Amino acid sequence: MTAIVDIAAREILDSRGNPTIEVDVTLEDGSQGRAAVPSGASTGAHEAVELRDGDKSRFGGKGVLKAVENVDRDIFDALSGLDAEDQVHIDQVMLELDGTPNKGRLGANAILGVSLAVAKAAAEASSLPLYRYVGGVQARVLPVPMMNIINGGAHADNPIDFQEFMILPVGAPNLKEAVRWGAEVFHVLKGALKKAGHNTNVGDEGGFAPNLPSAEASLEFIVKAITDAGFKPGEDIYLGLDCASTEFFKDGKYVYEGEGKTRNLEEQAAYLGKLVESFPIVTIEDGMSEDDWEGWKILTDLIGKKCQLVGDDLFVTNVSRLSQGISKGIANSILVKVNQIGSLTETLAAVDMAQRAGYTAVMSHRSGETEDSTIADLAVATNCGQIKTGSLARSDRLAKYNQLIRIEEELGSQAVYAGRAALKALA
């Protein structure tokens, strides 16, 4: 009854107006699953390959018709008749069919679209919500949202070198209230930026991109907005950074073009340590560049006990890179992006490896998103306790928050909001 009878892919548009792939999977009993694949702006060099057409006459070469064709032909031929409930086998068949270490032949976007759609179809056939189908009866922890409210770096056209400044409403009693707290801070911040003469248009992920001179200036604006919204910084709401340091790592140095400063490895670590001392920062993502293992070690030794250090470009949701990091004592958390690795099975394996090693895991969106809210379900399915899915603007971001609100409501008294317990630095 759960045999795959049809797989159909199409080219749709993401939140930046770029093409991406959407896949529908139909099972013998009529159950269907649909998944749309996201895309990143600042991508790690070690990520799985997103297959683009390269035909400059369509979408500036960004079309995904080759990936669509790979789904409709090769992948469908390989999966037709297989049991959708055997997710591990289905993903393995696709990996073997691709035959490359980085999914470069079929495309990680093609493989992931099918992988997620198969899981959704199987969940429907089982009459279970996706989070319950993937996570079982223990799936009940609602994640702390890491809300990106000021943007810089590759996500904005302003002098700020760091890519994201986030708020984490850990003190909220539940997920729904956490979202409300975040929204209220967001609106207070908007008013403050406007009053100070800054542009309040929003960027790719719904955050503001004001012309502020430094990271410190951005953090000061956010701390004041938290206070003015009636919350306590460092108690109700903490701060987080995504430095995306790979983007400004040049010739072994960290070059802050916006600030006109250059820092070596030790100075970069010391600078981040100073920010943690000066502001209620509880998590820093990609504080060092993706292959700067030495810098990562310096940073981890310096502040790893008091701050969550998240590897995104460093680990790229890849178990082999994560295991290297664990063995070297580098970072203490992994950012989990389904399209960095390209299949549900491998995504879950990365979360499992992190949790077994005592690392935290943060489920994450990409800057190019769609209305697909799968990652909300996966955050609950894995009980990872943290989700990063943008600001409190743009429906491609809100789709995930709204899905979490629905899941919390559905779980009722079983639901647990992760709160402070999600972050070991606060435990």
From Swiss-Prot:
GO terms for cellular component: cell surface; extracellular region; phosphopyruvate hydratase complex. Pathway: Carbohydrate degradation; glycolysis; pyruvate from D-glyceraldehyde 3-phosphate: step 4/5. It is found in: Cytoplasm; Secreted; Cell surface. GO terms for molecular function: magnesium ion binding; phosphopyruvate hydratase activity. Belongs to the enolase family. Its main location: cytoplasm. This is Enolase. CDD domains: enolase. Pfam families: Enolase_C, Enolase_N. Its EC number is 4.2.1.11. The gene is eno. Mg(2+) binds at D242, E285, D312. Catalyzes the reversible conversion of 2-phosphoglycerate (2-PG) into phosphoenolpyruvate (PEP). It is essential for the degradation of carbohydrates via glycolysis. PANTHER family: ENOLASE. (2R)-2-phosphoglycerate binds at Q163, K337, R366, S367, K388. Its cofactor is Mg(2+). The keyword Nucleotide-binding does not apply. The keyword Iron does not apply. Binds a second Mg(2+) ion via substrate during catalysis. SMART domains: Enolase_C, Enolase_N. Keywords: Cytoplasm, Glycolysis, Lyase, Magnesium, Metal-binding, Secreted. One of its GO terms (biological process) is glycolytic process. InterPro entries: Enolase, Enolase-like_C_sf, Enolase-like_N, Enolase_C, Enolase_CS, Enolase_N. The active site is at E205, K337. It catalyses: (2R)-2-phosphoglycerate = phosphoenolpyruvate + H2O.
